[in-house]
Curated annotation (Swiss-Prot):
Protein name in UniProt: Sterile alpha motif domain-containing protein 12
GO biological process: cell surface receptor protein tyrosine kinase signaling pathway
Organism: Pongo abelii
Underlying gene: SAMD12
Domain of life: Eukaryota
Pfam families: SAM_2
Length: 201
């Protein structure tokens, strides 16, 4: 099973944040100033003209890959969101699962807390089906942790209602200082390591 990895660079002053400003050049760790694409003989420099379509497209793609889409955290998923997830990740048994999940009011928070015994009580009798669901839930937990880690490295973390007082009790955005980011980053790295180890059965 493949698990996506995330690399975060730490320096003595704090975390290296992804740069979004135009004109800033990033150096890839482990390589000199020249990256593999520059060393490639077929590489052609695009003239540094403002408005060049190829350059603008490349910058847009770089910005997209460096930022995290602020989607709704799994803990805030409704039953409908969980059913969409089930349909995507368990299409063969979707009808059976969706009915059982609706009857037991499984939201995102409950999905993250599912166990083998809970699934058995919900009427999913076959052990291999329960294990498949739990495997998908573990992968979801890893993706959620990676997402949170990426948000932390960007200095922004979206918190669910009730965790932090906000205007009209909506989702709040917490901006973390460098020391807070480093401490939370280490905590998330430990959690991801634990989850990855538990996936490798």
């Amino acid at each position: 099973m493949a698990v996506e990895a995330l690399h975060c660079g730490l320096n003595p002053r704090g975390i290296d944040h992804p740069a979004h400003a135009e004109g800033i050049k990033l150096q890839i760790e482990g390589e000199g100033v020249e990256s593999q694409s520059i060393k490639n003989k077929n590489f052609q420099k695009v003239p540094d003209q403002k408005g060049t379509p190829k350059r603008l497209q490349a910058e847009a793609e770089t910005a997209k890959s460096a930022t995290v889409k602020l989607s709704k955290p799994v803990a805030l998923w409704t039953q409908q969101d969980v059913c969409k997830w089930l349909k995507k990740h368990c299409p063969n048994q979707y009808q059976i699962y969706s009915e059982s999940f609706k009857q037991h009011d499984i939201t995102g928070r409950a999905l993250l807390r599912l166990t083998d015994k809970k699934l058995e009580r919900m009427g999913i009798a076959q052990e291999n089906l329960r294990q498949h669901i739990l495997q998908q839930v573990l992968q979801l937990k890893v993706r959620e942790e990676v997402r949170n880690l990426q948000l932390l490295t960007q200095g922004t973390l979206l918190l669910p209602d009730g965790w932090m007082e906000g205007e009209m009790r909506r989702k709040s955005t917490l901006l973390l200082g460098q020391t807070g980011v480093r401490e939370n980053l280490l905590l998330f790295l430990r959690r991801i390591s634990f989850i990855e180890n538990s996936i490798q059965i």
